[in-house]
């Protein structure tokens, strides 16, 4: 693990590329941005494909991922957060890290909740995983606007199905 952390970003990126290619087929994904997120979070290069596969395809996941004691999230408040995040993000003209961050942090203020109560559900909807390299802002930036909104919509539908 130490060896990987000592590499420059370019060196790491070069070594990581063949592993990305195993699970990321979408040419519009900026692999260099993934390298920046991943380098400090990878012990061995062969772990890479399973850490990044969700960028290409959202895995099947259960709504229990939205329930997190420490983050103070449950199915109800996650649904509300996703609905509001969808509304706000869909209005964004410039899809940049800063714009996404400002939008979601303003939403946190507006809803008067903890950061995690908006960011955990969004990150979960975008990755479909318990843990991911990077949080809501990074993932949204890399996935792009259409895919981000699409995945949030899927999260909303999953959560709505459990409320009946």
What are these regions (language model features)?
Residues 1-8, 132-138:
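Short His/Asp/Glu-rich catalytic/ion-coordination signatures at enzyme active sites or charged loops
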Residues 2, 43, 127:
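Residue-level marker of positions within ordered structural domains that often coincide
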Residues 5-111:
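Small-residue-rich helix-loop
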Residues 98-163:
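Charged substrate- and nucleic-acid-binding regions of tRNA-handling and nucleotidyl-transfer enzymes
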